[in-house]
């Protein structure tokens, strides 16, 4: 992809009917959307702390009351996970579902167990 400069590998939890196509589709998702982690657990705590601080600073600049900052920043972190973790991203071939929901539609017990994205240049 991208002039043969991006490669992705995807690991699924089982080899069931449709798994090969599903893995190919998820690999395409990872190549196109450049997630930083598989799921919430894979995101470094320092990244989350930084995102929370950025969100709070933006909210303060907008004049939001201090009492509301924590709840609003939690919502912003959920949005961060949705945009930046592979299984929570909107599936590029069907934006009405997440990647996790797409995988479940292939096989109820199927999950994405890992991925690796490499870009040259």
List each model region and its residues.
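N-terminal assembly/interaction segments in proteins that build large macromolecular machines
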Residues: 1-121
């Amino acid at each position: 992809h991208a002039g043969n400069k991006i490669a992705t590998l995807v690991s699924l939890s089982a080899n069931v009917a449709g798994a090969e196509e599903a893995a190919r589709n998820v690999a395409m998702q990872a190549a196109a959307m450049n997630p930083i982690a598989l799921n919430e657990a894979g995101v470094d705590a320092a990244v989350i702390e930084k995102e929370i601080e950025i969100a709070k600073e933006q909210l303060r600049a907008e004049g939001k009351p201090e009492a509301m900052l924590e709840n609003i920043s939690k919502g912003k972190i959920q949005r961060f996970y949705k945009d930046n973790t592979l299984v929570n991203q909107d599936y590029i071939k069907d934006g009405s579902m997440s990647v996790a929901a797409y995988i479940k539609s292939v096989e109820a017990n199927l999950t994405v167990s890992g991925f690796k994205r490499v870009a040259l240049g």
